[in-house]
């Protein structure tokens, strides 16, 4: 039986990964360490709360004693780090939090793994161990109208969020180069799908449109992103963990580049047609001041992971957005719970005066 220590898996991508792995593998153990910040939600794991293969631990990846104890107790074969503050707008307001979670938290995980797995006298690592860092294409910066990010593209982050993720990636690489730690890094494009906190574009649009609230669009809305259905991403992480070449970075993209305004209009059209609600229309769109340092285009070339591991994105955007909207409409109680209280205060801070 393989054991995974997965961090941040009460959040969006992490909780989907837990569901994916439990469905795919019977003989598995997932130890899930999550601090349960605003975007970490135990309701994301409600349907597996009685599954003995999943062990939830509330705690911080910065807590050295806790991480050390978990590694000693469960002896994980893999440590996969999903834990991160991930919203660019929040990083612009409070960059210190991003340094603490994304940089210092990653360094603590790396050091704890090294302490447990590395024999300094023999200069050898325990067999079958690996650390995998889940990162983002935003570490590469911005693209022009043509071309794609490749694994060899220099890191050039533009926001405090992407700077924190790039720094974490460099520490992961440094532990590999300095100590020989077995590692991989995955860098993904924009994920969408179930369980995503509604500060992110697609669930925010769905929630606002249902309630006939304004749909805020940064600038002209022509910023282009590559959209990756979250379960395709989970499959890629599984394949990299179990088959990725030691020390390698793998880009994970969806081949689904779309301008943000296209996403907005697609969600409006889908909800209008599904709900037969004339109040859901493009009249809800409101262009607001553009985000500071907002990159115009991201695009990923996933050729390497396809050639090395056989992975490819199985879900075209046209299918994925239908699945995603259907999930949120079927889980209104989940949305109501996560958008209460502190979310309302945050939303007002971000958009009230724009």
Protein language model features and the residues they cover:
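C-terminal substrate-binding subdomain of Rossmann-fold SDR/epimerase-dehydratase oxidoreductases
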Residues: 4, 17, 24, 30, ...
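N-terminal Rossmann-like NAD(P)+-binding domain of SDR-like oxidoreductases, especially those catalyzing
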Residues: 1-191, 241, 295, 323-331, ...
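Residue-level signature of the cytosolic catalytic core of signaling kinases
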Residues: 41, 145, 194-198, 256, ...
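Proline-centered turn/helix-capping motifs that create local helix->coil transitions or kinks
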Residues: 121-123, 141-145, 180, 196, ...
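Residue-level recognition of oxygen-bearing side chains
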Residues: 66, 97, 104, 197-201, ...
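The catalytic Tyr-centered alpha-helix of NAD(P)H-dependent dehydrogenases
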Residues: 146, 157-164, 194, 198, ...
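Residues at alpha-helix caps and immediate loop-helix transition turns in enzyme cores, especially N-
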Residues: 41-44, 94, 145, 197-201, ...
